[in-house]
From Swiss-Prot:
Signal peptide: none annotated. This is UTP--glucose-1-phosphate uridylyltransferase 1. It comes from the Bacteria. Pfam families: NTP_transferase. One of its GO terms (molecular function) is UTP:glucose-1-phosphate uridylyltransferase activity. Disulfide bonds: none annotated.
Length: 304
């Protein structure tokens, strides 16, 4: 059996929801306190046992490559000043086996994954979406990517991460139609549906940003016609794959943080900061003070 060694991180999106910040800075480089969002993804991959990572980028994404490259001047300066803890943090971002390829035009997630065909070869691989951060406030939790890899060791089949979402939100996700009940959190899947209307959704089990796929997906993606949004949808290709190979779905029970929009990004930043040793106490005190001020502002005043 071929071991899962490789991961793909699609990072070619334009990041329009975060303009003007993303005009010159990659969305994936926006920090949660002091760490870019893409670094959380890379750390999850490494913690799971992934050996090689391909980042699929687009225009104005050079900052991602720079972040994971060495910076001699910075490293020399930190070493000379004896700032060893900071030097260690910098070193952790450079000792990684990362590769980069550019998606020339944003034609959808399926097309971004297809750019990795030569990198992956004939091996199973993981796709990790940068908008979904998993259990970042729980260092002891088993990474979701690791859970998918363990499932593959048992089934030798593609496995997609899913999570229950409010029924009214299903139109924002790909959704699975499960076959029967889950066995230890693992579902057999009948069909995959991309962004159904709530009244048409086969379940509340939404696909979240982790996929373990067999290499046969590439042949399907090469023939895939554009779907929702006139883009090549990975969900559609997985549904086609499911007709010739079994595809499973792993239900994620941990905490998922969606950093794909402003409010989700702010919530994630607050939750992570409340666990950050350098800022958590000050932030807690500030939130308590702010909460009292907001409650006071709600009290109606009565004029005589």
């Amino acid at each position: 059996m071929t071991k899962v060694r490789k991961a793909i991180i699609p990072a070619a999106g334009l990041g329009t929801r975060f303009l003007p910040a993303t005009k010159a800075l990659a969305k994936e480089m926006l920090p949660i306190v002091d760490k870019p969002t893409i670094q959380f993804i890379v750390e999850e991959a490494l913690k799971s046992g992934i050996e090689e990572i391909l980042v699929v980028t687009g225009k104005a994404k050079r900052s991602i490559e720079d972040h994971f490259d060495s910076n001699f001047e910075l490293e020399y300066n930190l070493q000379a000043k004896g700032k060893n803890e900071l030097l260690k943090l910098v070193d952790e971002t450079t000792a990684i086996n990362l590769h980069f390829i550019r998606q020339s035009h944003p034609r959808g997630l399926g097309d971004a994954v297809l750019q990795a065909k030569a990198f992956v070869g004939n091996e199973p691989f993981v796709v990790m979406l940068g908008d979904d951060l998993m259990d970042i406030t729980n260092a002891s939790a088993k990474p979701l990517t690791k859970q998918l890899m363990e499932d593959y060791d048992k089934t030798h089949a593609s496995t997609i991460a899913v999570m229950k979402v409010p029924h009214e939100d299903v139109s924002s996700y790909g959704v699975i139609a499960p076959q029967g009940k889950a066995v230890k959190g693992l579902y057999s899947v009948d069909t995959f549906v991309e962004k159904p209307q709530p009244e048409d959704a086969p379940s509340d089990l939404a696909i979240i940003g982790r996929y373990l796929l067999t290499p046969e997906i590439f042949g399907i993606l090469e023939r895939q016609t554009p779907g929702a949004g006139n883009e090549v949808q990975l969900t559609d290709a997985i549904d086609t794959l499911n007709k010739t190979q079994r595809v499973f779905a792993r239900e994620f029970k941990g905490n998922r943080y969606d950093v794909g929009d402003k409010f989700g990004f702010m919530k994630t930043s607050i939750d992570y900061a409340l666990e950050h040793p350098q800022v958590k106490e000050d932030l807690k005190n500030y939130i308590i003070k702010l909460g009292k001020a907001l409650e006071k502002s709600k009290v109606p005043t009565h004029s005589k």
